[in-house]
Design a protein with these regions (language model features):
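Juxtamembrane helix-loop-helix connectors linking adjacent transmembrane helices
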Residues: 74-169, 187
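Transmembrane helix-loop-helix hairpins at the membrane interface
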Residues: 132, 136-263
Length: 263
């Protein structure tokens, strides 16, 4: 049995504690927790194969519902009120979510294999490679499409944005898209000659489609960025994918229009 990824769990728990200082949980949130526990028990047991499949199916449904904020009992606090970080940017606001991080807790506790432990040296190399590629593809593409421009800044709310993005956004998204989806597909497609490449591309495409509400440009850019994150995960594990994703978000936030140009 794989050891639990305590460092990842500790970081996510710290972020969740930060979110609780801005929002709160209602008793109805207990229903979601109970369903996740049921899914986890079913997915972890080894006696009934169909039970494992049903457990993962229930988790996928819950992950979608939590990510879309469909479930009751979660009162997410707003950490940043609507404002423009630069005069030419669209207004940005930020909530510290209490529902979406439960996806990360479930994955780290039920599927610790998603971590893909690698050496520190390999992780650093994979992060540097993934970040360089994703920055060239995604930020370069965003500049070419005219959705961002050069706009270096460090607003007063930057530190809160940083903690939220690292602990509650990037960690959870990479655990889901790279660890669970790419890692799971890689395991099931390993008999194919290009199974790992196909898993990476499918996970990147799903990650891009998750940004559909922002427009086709962001679907394309997120898909391209996902290729860099996926390579970081393949060679450096979950920590490298998180570092790559967060590094790109930090470059976008600190050096370019955030979140995008108005109009």
């Amino acid at each position: 049995m794989l050891a639990l990824p305590w460092i990842h769990l500790a970081l996510l728990s710290f972020g969740y504690g930060l979110a609780l200082t801005y929002g709160h949980l209602g008793w109805l949130a207990g229903i979601s927790v109970a369903l996740l526990l049921t899914a986890g028990f079913a997915a972890r047991q080894q006696h009934v194969r169909i039970g494992r499949y049903l457990g993962h199916a229930l988790f996928i449904f819950m992950a979608l519902a939590l990510a879309m904020h469909w479930l009751p009992g979660f009162y997410n606090g707003r950490g940043i009120n609507p404002q423009r970080f630069t005069d030419d940017a669209v207004r940005f606001s930020m909530y510290l979510n209490l529902d979406k991080p439960l996806i990360g807790f479930w994955l780290l506790l039920v599927c610790p294999w998603i971590v893909g432990q690698r050496s520190l040296r390999l992780g650093i190399f994979a992060t540097a490679m993934g970040l360089t590629l994703s920055a060239l593809l995604a930020l370069g593409g965003a500049l070419l499409l005219g959705v961002i421009s050069w706009a270096p800044k460090w607003p007063d709310q930057a530190w809160l944005w940083l903690f939220n993005n690292l602990l509650l956004v990037t960690l959870v998204e990479e655990a889901l898209f790279r660890g669970y989806i790419q890692g799971g597909l890689s395991r099931h497609l390993k008999h194919l000659p290009y199974g790992e490449n196909l898993a990476l591309l499918l996970a990147s495409l799903l990650f891009g489609l998750a940004h559909l509400a922002a427009g086709w440009q962001w679907v394309l850019l997120a898909t391209l960025a996902g290729v860099g994150y996926g390579l970081a995960y393949r060679f450096g594990g979950l920590a490298a994918a998180i570092a790559t994703h967060f590094g790109l978000n930090l470059l976008h936030f600190g050096l370019f229009t955030y979140p995008m140009l108005a109009g």
